[in-house]
Amino acid sequence: MAFDKDAIIDSLKEASISDLNDLVKAIEEEFDVSASAPVAVAGAAGGDAAAAKDSYDVELTESGDQKVKAIKAVRDITGLGLKDAKGLVDNVPSIIKEGVSEDEANDMKAKLEEVGGVVTLK
């Protein structure tokens, strides 16, 4: 069987966010690996390391009891369709948005926590 990298990439381009999330989880389980980015360990830089961060990833770690409201909040924040937003809420933990400013990340966190979600800023 020939390995066709381009065919795999083309099929990934057509997949929904929910399908890609399921694929990542299946690969993690099959190969006993983690798709999370390695965390750099800060040296003796002091407390300024956290303050110097200029972009954040908003991760929904728990969707809470009000899933419909959580899905609506994710749709409002991301602009995703219903199916993709539902996939993110159903498959927590999931990254809602990457590389946003601190103010924008805190606004998103507040909106998701309003509907019972638990959010982590990375």
From Swiss-Prot:
Please provide the Gene Ontology terms (biological process) for this protein. Answer: translation
Annotated disulfide bonds: none
Organism domain of life: Bacteria
Q: Name one GO cellular component term.
A: cytosolic large ribosomal subunit
Q: Which Pfam families match?
A: Ribosomal_L12, Ribosomal_L12_N
Which keywords does the record carry?
A: Ribonucleoprotein, Ribosomal protein
Q: Name one GO molecular function term.
A: mRNA binding
SUPFAM superfamilies in UniProt: ClpS-like, Ribosomal protein L7/12, oligomerisation (N-terminal) domain
Function as written in the Swiss-Prot or TrEMBL entry? Forms part of the ribosomal stalk which helps the ribosome interact with GTP-bound translation factors. Is thus essential for accurate translation.
The record's HAMAP family line, in alphabetical order, gives:
Ribosomal_bL12
Tell me the subunit arrangement.
Answer: Homodimer. Part of the ribosomal stalk of the 50S ribosomal subunit. Forms a multimeric L10(L12)X complex, where L10 forms an elongated spine to which 2 to 4 L12 dimers bind in a sequential fashion. Binds GTP-bound translation factors.
| The family this protein is said to belong to | Belongs to the bacterial ribosomal protein bL12 family.
- Per its record, how is this protein called by name? Large ribosomal subunit protein bL12
